[in-house]
Amino acid sequence: MPSLFHGVYQALYDYEARTEDELTFSENSLLYLLEKSSTDEWLKAKKAGPAGTNEIGLVPLTYIEPAPAKRQAYALYDYDKQTEEELTFKEGDALTVYDDSDSEWLLVCRGGDEYGFVPANYTGDAPPSAAPAPVAAIPTPVAAIPTPAGQPTTPITKDSPLPPLPKDAFPPPPQAYRPPASTTHASTEPVYANGRDEESPPPMPARPGGSGNGSGRPSSGAGDSRSRGSSVSRSRNASSANDKPSSSSANFFTWPVQEVDGRKKRKATLAIGNGMIMFSPERSSGQPQQWPVKDLVNYNSEKKHVFLDFKHPTVSFDLHLGSKDTADEVIYALGELAGAYNSSGLTEVMMAANSAGQKLGKVLYKFDAQGRDEVSVEEGENVFIIDDTKSRDWWMVKNSSGVAGVVPSSYIEIAPSEKTLKKVVDQQRKASGSSRDKSRDRSRDDRSRDRADKRSSRSSRDAPKSKPDPRKVRTWTDRSGAFKVDAALLGCVDGKIHLHKVNGVKIAVACSKMAIEDLEYVEDVTGVDLEEDKPLSRDRGGSSRDRRRSTSRSDRRKSSSGAASSANAPKPTPESDYDWFGFFLDCGVDVHACQRYATSFTRDQMDESILPEVTPSTLRSLGLKEGDILRVTKKLDEKYGRSGTGTSASTPVGGNPSGGLFSDTTGALKNNTSKTLTKADDTDPWSSLDKQQAPPQQQAPPVQQQPPVQQQPIQAQPTAPIQQQPIQAQPTAPIQPVRTGSINDLMNIKPLQPTPTSSNLQTQATGGIMQPIQQQYTQQPMSQSTSALPQQSMNTGILPQTTGPLQQSLTGSAPVQNPFLTGGPNTLLSQQTGGLVGVPTGGLVGVPTGGLQGVPTGYTAQNVLGMNQPANTGGYSMNAITNALAGASLNKQQQQQQPMVQQLTGGSMFGQQPMQQQLTGSSIFQQQPMQQQFTQQQPMQQQFTQQQPMSQQLTGGSIFNSQPQQPFQQQPMQPQQTSFQQQQPFSTGASASPFGSQPTTPFGQPQQSAGLSYFNNIQPLQQQQAFGQQMQPQQTFQPQQPFQQPFQQPFQQQQQQPFQQQQQQPFQQQQQPFGGLQSQPTGFGFGNSSSPFGGMQSQQTGAPSTSFGQQPLQPTATGRQRANLASATPNNPFGF
């Protein structure tokens, strides 16, 4: 057999493998060349190392060179290699040693071209002819026995080489090692003394071995292979104590073992010798267990474990010996012991075989003798049958001990013929003769098997892999796009696609992970249906045309793939030709339900010819949903021109002619939302007012026309009701009467509308003036309400305020308006007398309440707030300081410069500007009646409360078209804050300062109340209304100059005087007119100027003259505001 290695090389440099096929090595490493290449500069080599480290790979030729030889050796004996890595040689062959790192095996070269491993103890440094040492080695003392066989010749070879001797002069190798072995091991190995001369060469060392393995190998080489093999194994795997015989007997051999019991291991000692087997646990205090060799039923080994089965008593052991060699040694010892025991039985067998007429039998069951003529036998024991004819039930037998007796014949089985006995004897002989070599052969076979396995794996790994057909290679991608591979399709089995990659590796990928394009490719190539593995999102997102195309493709694929299998099957029925799936998709059915419906139609063998006859009842029987039934029926009606009025299409299963829950008698879907919309129109609160107050806007008949609209086809339903509903709603038309209606209703609630003010005004002033004023007042809110439709919420919000404070204010204000001449003075007197406190509560209450009664309840809150604001009239000096300084004089000038129309449009400005006009006597005040101003203020305040721009109010107020919205937008914001904070202080001053109407002190209370009402959004309206009512008489009595003069004088004075003077003096002067104001509120009818005015003066003389004199007022107002700020409180912010 050729050598495995082709050369030995040494590495010149370090090299790191770059691929799996390459080999990593370091400098000066030994490499065994396995293959030479003539095409490139890469060689296949094996890296030298311990056994089991078979590192094989490619190495670059430029990185290695032939390894130098270490020394020269010679073969001492003939040797035939056992594996392909070893080398066969003859005695005396010259060997070149390249690697001697292993003490038992050398890597050598023979003849310059054969490389391999050889046993180290089969070689020597000198040729066999040059070694005379064996003759001299015999008389050497025992102490020199451990010297190796080649050691005595080494110094002779170096110092004085001897001429070669004839071969017959050199004794045979076994004779050289026999004397020392006999003297040394005679006592330790008596059992193995037999047949020591069978083998002369030294034993084979273990192939895998390191530097430590050779330390325990005997150096003398004496003894036969059996003794040497056992001793070497023991010395290599056991401690030195284990090699020594036990103290009880020199023939016992012991090994430390571990008994395996489940997951536990217990230390113990196993001893074999003298025909006995003993087992002694380490922690046991009693006697060790022992069995004779005949009780050993079975023994075997597996790697490091030895299994023993005994009888008498029956016990089984699983022993762990630490290494496989130790386990083999124990098995070897047991085999020798069992062979020695069986040798005596074999002699008896031979004697029985040679004896005539005697048969051999085997005991099947254990039998204990109970009589004198009986004999005890054990199960499995061989006995001689002496007589089996005397009795059929009892046979005379003789056991192995020579004791004869009778045993039941059923307990004995006759042994086979003599041929069988001879075969048994031969087997026993062979077993005893070959058992000594079992361990050695087993280890050698294991090594050979391992090498063969490694070679096979290496060859399989190195074998070139098959490549796929380049024409079938394509790029495959998974569904996520992260995995891509170039491979050819092998097939699709069990939901997996088998691919052959370009590198030769074959893989299988689940169909559910592959992209849709790849699945379609597999379907086209293999004909396998993979629709279930495709994602559902594709079906949802794709168009119906794509889904039909995919379905048709799958149908064609199924038909093509099943053509061969369906050759013997009946021909497909015509129903399979019609695409029910596409039909339902065209009808608008959900894609998930299409397949289920298609399966039902196909299962019932329905084709396209039955479509004209399909009715809703047929569709229901096939499991279609109601909505899908309507879609399919509609599609069929359109396709075949059916009217859709027949019972087949419109009548449900139950035969209800009135239609179903969702469809009418015509089969069309019902518009259930139309009824709801109709009810919404009926329940609209504004619509009821529209119907009552705006008859021309009512459109009930169109609402009644909706039922016939429902009877129209489904397509016409959405348009018809949509056109009529906006006509019914007409938010603008109903809202206008709604707003005016709410105001009119509040006005017409009229405990107040009989308006004593109107009667008083008629008596006080010319009725002609009052009538146009009232007409304007009623008309203006109407127009204003039309523009302010969204302000209904404001009215609703004001209503609760009116209920609480209005009623009180109304009660208080009604007498103020009716007896405006008589009761007015009283009210004003209480207000003035109360000073600042009494004025806001009493004075303004009466004034705004009178106006508020006419005004809707929404402005009642203004009266309450107006009460506080008129209280500010008492503190007219305070407001003058803050408001008059900032806005009073300036605003007055602006108001004078700007037309009163603009100020009136401003809302609260409205009340203030007219007062300025009245005070100054300007034609503007006379031109625009106060009622109009107040009436406009009310809608404006409503709008203001609704936070709508005052511009809309101005637009709504036709009377004040001349008044621009600018003053209202500019001034009201500032006065609101100032006047609102100064509610407790007199509102006249606060309102006047922001609105510039403060100079009109005679109208201070109402004007300021108007300004405050603008700030308070609610109160100003009431006050303005009340004031407006009062002002109405003033306007009617515009010719009354005396009343206007007091207003004009202080107002002019305030205007003429510098701004600082307005702060001080105007307040003083204003108090003088303020007394007039008190009389004016009583005489707000101005027609009563004579009588109530006098009353007002008297009131002023009573309270103001004594406490609020003209001159004392200046220090009081200015001083209190400036000096008492330190004593300000939340209720008295200015420290009055």
Curated annotation (Swiss-Prot):
Give any Pfam family that matches. PH_SLA1
- Give positions of region: Disordered: 143-251, 423-475, 532-573, 640-739, 775-810, 928-1011, 1024-1136
GO terms in the biological process aspect are: actin cortical patch assembly; endocytosis; regulation of actin filament polymerization
Bias (Polar residues) ranges: 663-677, 787-810, 988-1011, 1096-1136
Report biased composition (Low complexity) as residue ranges. 216-251, 692-737, 775-786, 928-953, 962-987, 1024-1095
According to its record, how does it sit in the membrane? Peripheral membrane protein
**What protein is this chain from?**
Actin cytoskeleton-regulatory complex protein SLA1
Query: Which species?
Result: Yarrowia lipolytica (strain CLIB 122 / E 150) (Yeast)
